[in-house]
């Protein structure tokens, strides 16, 4: 097996011929259960039908009308749990490869320089968004379509949030994200980077300048485990992924690594280590395979790279670089040693600087995305729901509509 490069996509895309061939497998269901299963309402049933009839522009328009991050979602969405699970073709042989068809169309859109988005009218007043991650980016597009003048305030030097700083380049190339953001900026969305709302800029200042404010602060901080405080060479998964991403994979890796966790972030860490040349990578999760949190796509690709995945064990003791695990249901014990230990045990947002916003367990209390302050809304990872990119897109769209409804009512009073 040839060596995988960190900057090269792990999964190859479709050629036009292969895309048409795959789309021709579609049963053209009238009720399109695949479309019903998409949280972002990207409508795969409709765009696959367009591919089937060689109407690639129509397919691109369908995707972009519903999902401003269509090219991103095509690469990182857990489609096997969503649209592909709903695919009727599964009852015959296997589901349509919806993700790669969506990727083919969004790549074709870029290659042929399609102009689907048009600049907004900016006649309904100004709205501010805090955070340029997937929820904030999608909300900005929906609000711009509705006629608002939108400014996004981003703490980091570049927009994208977790898409830029956390997801490895072999899953999501930076060029793809840059192209998505360029389209959004061309619509007239203003993105201000290096702006720390809650720090140098207060929420009160934004409220005074804008008709409404949408918070889409992501869960950019990795969690740790007290058990590992005295362990040697421990790193938080979020920090490791960001380090690798910023250096385009040009970082040193250990001879052996032990990852604690079984989600998509743990799989990304394990895959990154393997691709960068770490000979021995082991991932240990407390969940058993039947309830494994990682998507099937990520789990399978990580295993294919040669990562050892152990399920059903939880850490109970640490001594230097040695970790002892107990099985969650049985009496089994396991001790593993590695040069580096990486913790992928969850993430949280920094909400300390937003004391005026009510939050519990890192989730902001909202009603239809509206906080206790009627002019402040929240979406993305900091509201209840799945912590996936496609769900962030969904909440961004819905929060934008909620803001529009609120401002329309305010005008009619």
From Swiss-Prot:
UniProt keyword annotations, A-Z: NAD, Oxidoreductase
* Pfam families to which the protein is assigned, alphabetical: Fer4_20 (PF14691), Pyr_redox_2 (PF07992)
SUPFAM superfamilies, A to Z: alpha-helical ferredoxin (SSF46548), Nucleotide-binding domain (SSF51971)
Where NAD(+) binds, per the record, is at 287
Q: What name does this protein carry?
A: NAD-dependent dihydropyrimidine dehydrogenase subunit PreT homolog
Give the EC class as a word. Answer: oxidoreductase
Catalytic activity line of the entry: 5,6-dihydrouracil + NAD(+) = uracil + NADH + H(+); 5,6-dihydrothymine + NAD(+) = thymine + NADH + H(+)
In terms of superkingdom, the source organism counts as Bacteria
Q: Which GO terms describe its biological process?
A: pyrimidine nucleobase catabolic process
Q: A Gene Ontology MF term for this entry?
A: NADH dehydrogenase activity
Residue stretches spanning the membrane: none
Q: What does this protein do?
A: Involved in pyrimidine base degradation. Catalyzes physiologically the reduction of uracil to 5,6-dihydrouracil (DHU) by using NADH as a specific cosubstrate. It also catalyzes the reverse reaction and the reduction of thymine to 5,6-dihydrothymine (DHT).
The family this protein is said to belong to: Belongs to the NADH dehydrogenase family.
State the disulfide connectivity.
Answer: none
Assembly and partners are described as:
Heterotetramer of 2 PreA and 2 PreT subunits.
Q: EC?
A: 1.3.1.1
């Amino acid at each position: 097996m040839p060596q995988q490069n960190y900057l090269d996509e792990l999964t190859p895309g479709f050629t036009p011929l292969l895309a048409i061939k795959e789309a021709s497998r579609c049963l053209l269901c009238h009720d399109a259960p695949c479309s019903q299963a998409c949280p972002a309402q990207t409508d795969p049933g409709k765009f696959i039908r367009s591919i089937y009839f060689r109407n690639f522009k129509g397919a691109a328009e369908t995707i972009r009308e519903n999902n401003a991050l269509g090219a991103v979602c095509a690469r990182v969405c857990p489609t096997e749990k969503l649209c592909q699970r709903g695919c009727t073709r599964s009852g015959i042989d296997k589901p349509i490869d919806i993700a790669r068809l969506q990727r083919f169309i969004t790549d074709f859109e870029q290659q042929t320089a399609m102009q689907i988005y048009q600049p907004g009218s900016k006649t309904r007043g100004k709205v501010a968004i805090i955070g340029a991650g997937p929820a904030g980016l999608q909300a900005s597009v929906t609000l711009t379509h509705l006629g608002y003048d939108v400014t996004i305030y981003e703490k980091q030097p570049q927009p994208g949030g977790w898409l830029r700083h956390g997801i490895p380049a072999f899953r999501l190339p930076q060029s793809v994200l840059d192209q998505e953001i360029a389209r959004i900026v061309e619509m007239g969305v203003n993105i201000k980077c290096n702006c720390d709302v809650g720090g140098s800029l207060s929420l009160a200042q934004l409220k005074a300048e804008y008709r409404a404010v949408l918070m889409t602060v992501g869960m950019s901080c990795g969690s740790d485990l007290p058990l590992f405080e005295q362990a040697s060479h421990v790193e938080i998964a979020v920090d490791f992924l960001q380090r690798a991403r910023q250096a385009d994979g040009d970082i040193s890796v250990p001879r052996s690594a032990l990852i604690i966790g079984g989600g998509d972030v743990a799989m990304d860490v394990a895959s990154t280590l393997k691709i960068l040349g770490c000979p021995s990578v082991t991932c240990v999760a407390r969940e058993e395979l039947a309830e494994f949190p990682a998507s099937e796509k990520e789990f399978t690709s990580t295993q294919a790279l040669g990562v050892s995945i152990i399920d059903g064990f939880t850490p109970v003791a640490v001594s230097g670089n040695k970790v002892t695990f107990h099985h969650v249901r049985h009496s089994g014990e396991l001790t593993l040693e590695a040069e580096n230990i990486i913790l992928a045990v969850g993430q949280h947002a920094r909400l300390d600087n937003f004391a005026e916003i009510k939050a519990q367990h890192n989730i902001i209390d909202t009603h239809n995305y509206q906080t206790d302050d009627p002019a402040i809304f929240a979406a993305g990872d900091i509201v209840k729901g799945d912590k996936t990119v496609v769900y962030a897109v969904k909440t961004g769209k819905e929060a934008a509509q909620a803001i529009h409804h609120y401002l329309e009512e305010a005008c009619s009073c």
